[in-house]
A protein has these predicted regions:
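Charged, structured surface patches that assemble and position nucleic-acid processing machinery
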Residues: 1
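A structural signal for multi-pass alpha-helical bundles of membrane permease subunits
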Residues: 4, 9-12, 16-285
Length: 285
């Protein structure tokens, strides 16, 4: 009798596992099919892309990539994108870590209200304030400047960085380390840069990855503030090749791959730090 109960329980578990595996396969297919379609289309002629959208190319046309490279001025657009992204990431790391440390160690009503104010930046979409941002950038004479996009992206992404740094510091860094630094005569800045900052490497890695993905994929702010093609980013070059009535997908998709490939490589090599950084500060104690 007991054996029958055990066997029926095992069968139920097997059915659940099969159901979960089937769901995972379906989710993987939903994710993979568009990527597959994007990749194979980059090597097709326009006629073949229309006749056989998901088929393997009969003739692999590698010239599509060289044409896209020239048409979108990829080195210039790539350089602009890297400059904007790297500068924004550095500024967010500096400001976010210092603000997160200050809020983590300031146990006052004012500190709590400031933290709630920063959290509001996570809740309210920046698109709601885009008109105000446009007027501010124009009044500062930063139109058509990469620094306009950098400053706006810093303002958009800093609240999330502050939240991650604050929670990580509270969860993992004991006050005894800072008290020992105080005894050794360290000031606030020296204590932060010598003691606290080296311990923030896991969460810094997480913030770097998240902010890089956000800034690299940001399209609205470059579209508004970078009007000349010389200062444009990769996504702007891609959008310029989308026609109002028709689009050559075999020319557009290689541009998309050129723009996405560096980000995919970066994410593949850095994704383990996301889990490590988030889980380290997830549980206090």
């Amino acid at each position: 009798m007991m054996n029958k109960v055990k066997s029926s329980g095992i069968k139920k578990k097997d059915k659940k596992l099969w159901g979960l595996e089937l769901a995972m396969i379906l989710l993987a297919a939903i994710w993979f099919i568009p990527i597959y379609y994007l990749i194979v289309t980059t090597f097709k002629s326009p006629q073949e892309a229309t006749a056989s959208p998901l088929g393997i190319p009969k003739t692999w046309i590698f010239e599509n990539y060289s044409n896209a490279w020239k048409q979108m001025s990829f080195p210039r657009a790539f350089g602009n994108t890297v400059f904007i992204t790297a500068t924004a990431v550095i500024l967010i790391i500096v400001f976010g870590s210092m603000a997160g440390y200050a809020l983590a160690r300031t146990k006052t009503k004012l500190g709590n209200r400031m933290f709630l104010l920063f959290l509001a930046g996570l809740i309210v979409p920046f698109q709601m304030n885009i008109v105000s941002l446009y007027k501010i950038v124009k009044s500062l004479h930063l139109m058509n400047s990469a620094f306009a996009v950098i400053l706006v992206n810093v303002a958009i992404n800093t609240p999330q960085a502050i939240f991650l740094f604050k929670e990580f510091i509270e969860a993992t860094i004991p006050m005894e380390l800072e008290e020992a630094a105080d005894i050794d005569g360290c000031g606030v800045l020296k204590k932060f840069f010598r003691v606290i900052l080296p311990l923030l490497k896991p969460v810094i890695s997480t913030v770097v990855i998240i902010v890089t993905l956000n800034v690299w994929n940001e399209f609205l702010t470059p579209l508004l503030f970078l009007q000349s093609r010389e200062n444009g980013v990769i996504l702007q070059e891609v959008s310029r090749n989308i026609g109002q009535f028709s689009t050559d997908w075999t020319a557009l998709f290689p541009m998309l791959m050129l723009g996405v490939a560096p980000l995919m490589v970066f994410y593949i090599f850095m994704q383990k730090y996301i889990i490590g950084g988030v889980t380290t500060g997830a549980v206090k104690g």
